[in-house]
Amino acid sequence: MKKISFALLFCLCTLASFAQSGKPLNLKEIVSGEFIPQGISGVIPIPGDGEHYSQMNVDKTQIIKYSFKTGKPVEVLFDAATARECTFKTFDSYSFSPDGTKLLIATETTPIYRHSYTAVHYIYSLKRNINGEINNIVEKLSDGGPQQVPVFSPDGTMVAFVRDNNIYLVKFLYGNSESQVTEDGKRNAVLNGIPDWVYEEEFSFNRALEFSADSKMIAYIRFDETEVPSYSFPVFAGSNPHITAFEKYPGDYTYKYPKTGEANSKVSVHTFDIKSKVTRKMQVQMDADGYIPRIRFTHDPNKLAIITLNRHQNRLDMYFGDPRSTVCKQVLRDESDAYIKEAVFDNIIFYPENFSFVSEKSGYNHLYWYSMGGNLLKQVTAGNYEVKDFLGWDADDNSFYFTSNEESPLRKAVYKIDRKGKKTKLSAQPGIIPPSSVRT
């Protein structure tokens, strides 16, 4: 209700501001998209390149390579109309392998909740032969049904994904062989590698599955929601998406939904050794009713970062765990008088010797720089403004890049701080710069 009221208030204020300007508005102008902010979307830098990026064409039939320098197209990387053994005419999204030699193409995307969806994925190799030609063959990732959250291994030789709440692994070097990593996944009971509804909604993520830096281990969060109360609501045919099964009579949708004071999922972190096929449970020290909103492997394959929150969500702890011994060591704690924002999790970026952390400990959201041992090296930003997104660190000149609202709460600009602490604004035009448009 609060979200609806806020949205309505925003619309009314927006309309009122236009009315005060003397320009009358009509319904057609409001719904036509005339007032939608202008922006660039779908720009994906090509890994290991540094000079080019890619975009889908408007028809979603091609992936085109562009030059950063000129903004002009260089070549078509993929074309559904000409690719060999391609069974689809259009696609929904795509991603690159870390080395930039493969494309993972998503089709038949079906939404589940706010961030989650299933899709049928295909692999397309960008490797060239001695004549500089791509083999132009499309291969299905799996014949077992639609997948969730597929992710490449760092060496690009494997893809892990989730289907029916279980984790699967496809190895390209072994004829795209598929093996099952977990066995106990079950709807409304156990989820492996994907969050339950509460985690997805409150912590804004849809994948709880990571490869180690050396591609030898998989880490994942297991969600046991067997003790979470169920909630049901009627489902109708609707229009987006149109559910044919309920055209004449409504159906029921039942899922696990913990109301205030009810039990949440029991969460645990596990690792899977790809070679030995051994699964281990990590020894994480956390409250019985606490949360694990993120896990992430560092550059060191023997250090798995595990982030925990207490039930009140005002105390964050980060542990480094050894994926084989399962021993975990606390390296950081951050506390808030109110709560820890979920944006904090995604602003933790690991480098070989350091990691970044964004905190409100000073009263404003600012960037801090830590050693991998958990020692605070310095506070990078300071002042009466908020750092919104940490974009990255340049090891060559020890510079930090971030967005902040220093000029206005209504704007977000890109800044750089060099090794001497000098801050430079990099974005010339006023507006809002989304982190996905500049972070690489």
Language model region names:
Residues M1-K23:
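Bacterial Sec-dependent N-terminal signal peptides
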